[in-house]
Amino acid sequence: MSCSDKVRLAHEFFRRVWSPPHDLDAIDELMTEDYRITTAGKVISGRRDFKAWVAAMQKTCVGATNEHLDVFANAAGNMIVSRFRTRGINNGMFGLPADGAPVSFTGIAIWRVENGRLAECWVERSAFELYNQLCRS
């Protein structure tokens, strides 16, 4: 799998999972069985638990769409980095009232690729800024 194929893998993940119609079954195709994501200091392990986490996130950020602002693979071709923007409608993010306000936040995801699938991810989001945005709305 070339570096450009790995970049396409990240694009496909965002397009199929994080954009409507939010195809959670695509996770089985795009991720390894033991996929791990570290986000907000928490580790989610396995595709089943990852699907549940994505579904919960999509319930609090209705109609979520993600777009890559930048995406590239490292020289070795085993890592992909994406700077992204997520947009949606607040439906109770951070346990705050579901006020229907539009939300937008940025983040960085670093994926490890194994045998043509996403195997591990580390995500940092602009959660503090998003929280403040929601508290002001």
Where are these regions (language model features)?
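C-terminal and inter-domain tail/linker signature
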Residues: 1-137
